Amino acid sequence: GIDRITEISKSMRTFSRGDTATKIAFNIHEGIDSTLLILKHRLKANQSRPEIEIVKNYGELPEVNCYPGQLNQVFMNLIANAIDALEEGNSGRSFEEIKVHPNRITITTEVDGQKPKVLVKIKDNGIGMSKEVKEKVFQHLFTTKVVGKGTGLGLSISRQIVEGKHGGKITLISAEGKGTEFAIALPLT
């Protein structure tokens, strides 16, 4: 009990650490891990599906000069959207079917040495997106979620944080029935 509370408290401090006015050196893996801990309740098994698997392919990363709280918000938006896509894809599937073909989110980090930058890829094996949705997904107030579930701000804000505040790039690869991958490239300067 107490250990769990301590773990969550520490995670919340890591997650919100970045409301700084200037960029600071930050361990990206700590940010992702704290985000996963905060979202743990959504990843756990429930009556309709087994636990969502998280696969971490963490490479060796240097600390990144950034606004940690803002980047953590990006990780939160992308992972929460992946969970939503997986849950939507579970519609009409039995617990046993999902167990055989489990819901999975794969997070890969690496350094691209060509142009010194850190890459963070968040991929789900959910329902994927149509061409029409892909074209609009970063638009302000665009959402595919039912009223009350999504605001249409998450990906628009994520792009602004990655590209506007950090000089990075956020891209998307998705195909219907094949899942979705968001890739974040952050300069190492």
Predicted regions and their residues:
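Core catalytic ATP-binding domain of two-component histidine kinases
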Residues: G1-T189
